Amino acid sequence: MNYLENFTQKITDSGIEEEPAIVQYCKVLAAMIPSSLFVLDMVQKRFCYIKPDDLFLCGHSMEEAMTLGYDFFSKIIHPEDLPLWKSFLGNLSRTLQENSDEWSDYFGLFRLLPKYPFITKSLERYSYHRLIPVRKESGHYYLIGIVSDSKCKKIGCYRNGASRFIYQAYNPKKRGWHIQQIPLLSRRELEILAIATGEQYLHFIAEKLCLSYYTIRSHVSSIKRKLKVQDLREATDWISYLHILQSPQERDREESCCSTRNFTFNKN
């Protein structure tokens, strides 16, 4: 279990029912990570907490987001992606109501619509949402969302499977989950992805692995075909979401937070 799962498990197991205590936990979590973070009360359909970070707020005020609750997502998520998000939230709410033991590693990829002063043209920003449901013994449940920038354009809602060979993709039309097989990457392809930072560094990768530029280019073409992505940056993000290979940012974050895994706070 990584530090994030360990931290949210403390919230679930703590026996704390008061919302302020849960928010206090999440404020500490927000300080530990560079990403945006929000806590959504899925029963009352409102935000309990939003980290004051512009990535998630997209230029809107904290007060506006807290006032609008669920409706705030209509302000920041691309209109083409919004129906998927709403359908996923509805499905997750039903799942948590029916199964108190439900816990899955959910994540979503959406286009956000940041609002900038003096720019009238609508801009898109691809984002990754780590989605963690937290269910209290009282039956009340929350959704912790951790939002960061992404190079991956595979818009959708996903959850990692029990096996490292599969994941599940949410189908909003059928309102259900469908198993997808994770493409099998060769050892050499994984080595390339482990050190890849962009297409312009193929010569660097070739030198690092003592292979020719054309051999590396052939492997990269195979990676893009298997993962159905456009470039190496998108590929490295996608495989980190599926836990095929941790991204350097995730490794650095986990190592920097390892000393806080046993964190507790005064409940009084």
What are these regions, as identified by a protein language model?
Residues 193-200, 239:
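Short helix-to-turn junction characteristic of helix-turn-helix DNA-binding domains
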Residues 188-192:
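The N-cap/first-turn positions of alpha helices
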Residues 14-72, 165-178:
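PAS-family sensory domain signal
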